[in-house]
Design a protein with these regions (language model features):
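Conserved class I S-adenosyl-L-methionine
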Residues: 1-50, 64-68, 86, 145-172, 176, 209
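Class I SAM-dependent methyltransferase SAM/SAH-binding core
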Residues: 56-58, 62-106
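A short acidic, Gly/Pro-enriched loop at the edge of an enzyme's catalytic core
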Residues: 105-117
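A short SAM/SAH-binding and catalytic strip from SAM-dependent methyltransferases
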Residues: 116-129
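A short glycine-rich, Lys/Arg-flanked "PGG" loop and its adjoining helix->strand segment in the class I
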Residues: 130-145
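Short alpha-helix
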Residues: 177-200
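Core SAM-dependent methyltransferase catalytic element
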Residues: 212-232
Length: 232
């Protein structure tokens, strides 16, 4: 893990994760783009989407990932998140079987109960990745898959942009952010007994530049990534 402060070019005031997402909630659904995370899910070939009977969505937020999973035909989805206000929105979608407030490293969900565990845009808020991967491995059935989608460390380090939002006043605010190299993920996942089956990266392209014109200088830089980890 690398401290984000050495790459920080914005120097926004920074708030803890739960408080940050509570404050971000009014504009969250309109400012987080599917291009960052959801578009990376469908291309994953090592995930047997049609065979998944039960999924756990860790750091489910407002239910964006859960909604995508439901559209893929996954009927039984449990979700956990740290922020009660986010969970209230997720609950209103009516797609989760169970929802609970918990940390991704200690969900309280059942051992070996899930074919799929998803963690999207969460890892950059964790100082240590190991507890997350250990928890995902605990939740998975043998043969299950943990899909992690993250903010690419290259983009964080190159741009100096943390996870952030604008308050209603227009003031930008950062949410506590850490930088994990891709090798950090490999080390943490292997220590948890998981094996990497597939990885995808999302580049800044025309679609992204239409959404974020200021990102034009970063064309063809990776902005996010997805990893599919299997449990033997």
């Amino acid at each position: 893990m690398l401290e984000f402060s050495q790459f920080d070019r914005r120097r926004y005031p920074t708030v803890p994760v739960r408080e940050g997402y509570r404050q971000w909630l009014p504009s969250y659904e309109t400012t987080v783009e599917d291009e960052m995370d959801v578009v990376l899910l469908a291309p994953l070939e090592r995930v047997p989407w049609a065979a998944v009977e039960r999924a756990a969505d860790l750091g489910c937020g407002t239910g964006r990932t859960g909604a995508w999973l439901r559209k893929r035909g996954i009927a039984r989805i449990d979700g956990i998140d740290l922020t009660p206000e986010m969970l209230a929105i997720a609950r209103g979608r009516g797609i989760y079987e169970r929802l609970g407030q918990a940390d991704v490293a200690g969900t309280g969900l059942e051992d070996g109960a899930y074919d799929l565990v998803t963690t999207c845009l969460v890892d950059e808020h964790l100082r240590d990745l190991r507890p997350l991967y250990l928890e995902a491995a605990r939740l998975l059935r043998p043969g299950g898959v943990h899909v992690l989608v993250g903010y690419h460390p290259h983009f964080i380090m190159t741009t100096g942009i943390p996870t952030h939002f604008d308050r209603a006043t227009g003031e930008p605010v950062a949410i506590e952010t850490y930088v994990h190299l891709l090798s950090d993920h490999v080390s943490a996942a292997r220590a948890a007994g998981l094996s990497l089956g597939e990885m995808r990266e999302r580049l800044v392209d025309d679609r992204w530049i239409t959404l974020r014109p200021r990102w034009a200088p970063y064309r063809n830089h990776p902005v996010s990534f997805a990893m599919a980890w299997g449990k033997p």
